[in-house]
Amino acid sequence: MSDCCSPKGYRWIFSERSARSEAKRYRRKGLDSTSRRIIDFVKTQGVEGKTVLEVGGGIGAIQIELLKAGASRAISVELTPTYEEVAGELLREAGLVDRVDRSVMDFAAAAERVSSADIVILNRVICCYPDMPRLTGAAADHARRLLLMTYPRRTWWLRIGLGLGNVLLWLMRREFHIFLHPPSQIIATSGEHGLEPVLDEKGFIWTVAALRRAA
């Protein structure tokens, strides 16, 4: 991981306070629209009995919803421990503690320690990681069937907005950076690991992309 994004920087952005806020919103309103788009697509592909690996899943809401929809087990890999307590509370409330394995590590750097799954999800994760090919390649290698990813669209206004955000983070001396990795490179990297695109759905900010393991 580059010097721009240290564990300290991630913990400042993805804090315990942020986790509690996300959990409160999920309990009241359910999934946000981008996460719902992921769930809706996965359901069309068949989720019954499938295993799920989510990298950077935060409070674990997507995992919970897929397990409720029929997935057999889920694996969660988080870069920082700040979401673990709240995620555990949500699992206990849903009665799903024994069906989710949670761990804290840099997935891209320690992917060999993580089991593969039928469905792998990277929701709003690629834009927070400097080494896109390493992260995307590791995720693709772990996807036995489907890889779902979301990342910001490369519009002019997002480039300006995120650029200003990065300047502000630098001025505040926060060790964090937001990346607008080229979507074509993200998809090409996945293709190098045996996956074929099956979905490219653009929202106002986020693109939802899905790739399937080639036959």
Place the predicted regions along the sequence by residue:
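Short conserved loop adjoining the S-adenosyl-L-methionine
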Residues: A109-V114
